[in-house]
Amino acid sequence: MADPELQLVARRIRSFPNFPIPGVLFRDISPVLKDPTSFRASINLLANHLKKAHGGRIDYIAGLDSRGFLFGPSLAQELGLGCILIRKRGKLPGPTVCASYALEYGKGELEIQRDALEPGQKVVVVDDLLATGGTMCAACELLGQLRAEVLECVSLVELTSLKGREKLGAVPFFSLLQYE
């Protein structure tokens, strides 16, 4: 890990064993948000990756409820794009589409407004962390229901032992930091 910006972000990630339930090692991104320099570095690193991987092909960044909302708008702003929200069920007005998913420590449902995108628009999904892949997989399913093209999913942290990347199938995935 030679990149100084990446080192800065990595130093800000904290670990909490047995949270929120026994057996889970929680990776806390709060210190990244608290430190404007490390937050800016995380956005720069993700934006640089997306510029190299996709150039100007991205139409929207989709932020996942709730910590994806912390990174999605800033990343979209950095790239000169709009940000759409994929929320937990019951949080969006108007007609929506819904998908169920399993989490590392529970179950849930996500939804998106039916008019959030036009068919064929290209989207990158962002969240703070990839664990089992359930949330990102559900987000990709929702975007597919709207006939959008998911170019890639990205996160700050990936928990590799939970193999969430595999759940995404053919959708490319990128993370800044990987932990067992």
UniProtKB/Swiss-Prot annotation:
<keyword id="KW-0597">Phosphoprotein</keyword>
<comment type="function">
    <text>Catalyzes a salvage reaction resulting in the formation of AMP, that is energically less costly than de novo synthesis.</text>
</comment>
<dbReference type="GO" id="GO:0006168">
    <property type="term" value="P:adenine salvage"/>
</dbReference>
<dbReference type="GO" id="GO:0044209">
    <property type="term" value="P:AMP salvage"/>
</dbReference>
<comment type="pathway">
    <text>Purine metabolism; AMP biosynthesis via salvage pathway; AMP from adenine: step 1/1.</text>
</comment>
<dbReference type="GO" id="GO:0002055">
    <property type="term" value="F:adenine binding"/>
</dbReference>
<keyword id="KW-0328">Glycosyltransferase</keyword>
<feature type="modified residue" description="Phosphoserine">
    <location>
        <position position="15"/>
    </location>
</feature>
<feature type="modified residue" description="Phosphotyrosine">
    <location>
        <position position="60"/>
    </location>
</feature>
<dbReference type="InterPro" id="IPR000836">
    <property type="entry name" value="PRibTrfase_dom"/>
</dbReference>
<dbReference type="GO" id="GO:0003999">
    <property type="term" value="F:adenine phosphoribosyltransferase activity"/>
</dbReference>
<keyword id="KW-0963">Cytoplasm</keyword>
<dbReference type="InterPro" id="IPR029057">
    <property type="entry name" value="PRTase-like"/>
</dbReference>
<dbReference type="GO" id="GO:0016208">
    <property type="term" value="F:AMP binding"/>
</dbReference>
<dbReference type="GO" id="GO:0006166">
    <property type="term" value="P:purine ribonucleoside salvage"/>
</dbReference>
<dbReference type="Pfam" id="PF00156">
    <property type="entry name" value="Pribosyltran"/>
</dbReference>
<dbReference type="GO" id="GO:0005737">
    <property type="term" value="C:cytoplasm"/>
</dbReference>
<protein>
    <recommendedName>
        <fullName>Adenine phosphoribosyltransferase</fullName>
        <ecNumber>2.4.2.7</ecNumber>
    </recommendedName>
</protein>
<feature type="modified residue" description="Phosphothreonine">
    <location>
        <position position="135"/>
    </location>
</feature>
<feature type="modified residue" description="Phosphoserine">
    <location>
        <position position="66"/>
    </location>
</feature>
<keyword id="KW-0808">Transferase</keyword>
<feature type="modified residue" description="Phosphoserine">
    <location>
        <position position="30"/>
    </location>
</feature>
<comment type="subunit">
    <text>Homodimer.</text>
</comment>
<feature type="modified residue" description="N-acetylalanine">
    <location>
        <position position="2"/>
    </location>
</feature>
<comment type="similarity">
    <text>Belongs to the purine/pyrimidine phosphoribosyltransferase family.</text>
</comment>
<keyword id="KW-0007">Acetylation</keyword>
<keyword id="KW-0660">Purine salvage</keyword>
<dbReference type="InterPro" id="IPR050054">
    <property type="entry name" value="UPRTase/APRTase"/>
</dbReference>
<dbReference type="InterPro" id="IPR005764">
    <property type="entry name" value="Ade_phspho_trans"/>
</dbReference>
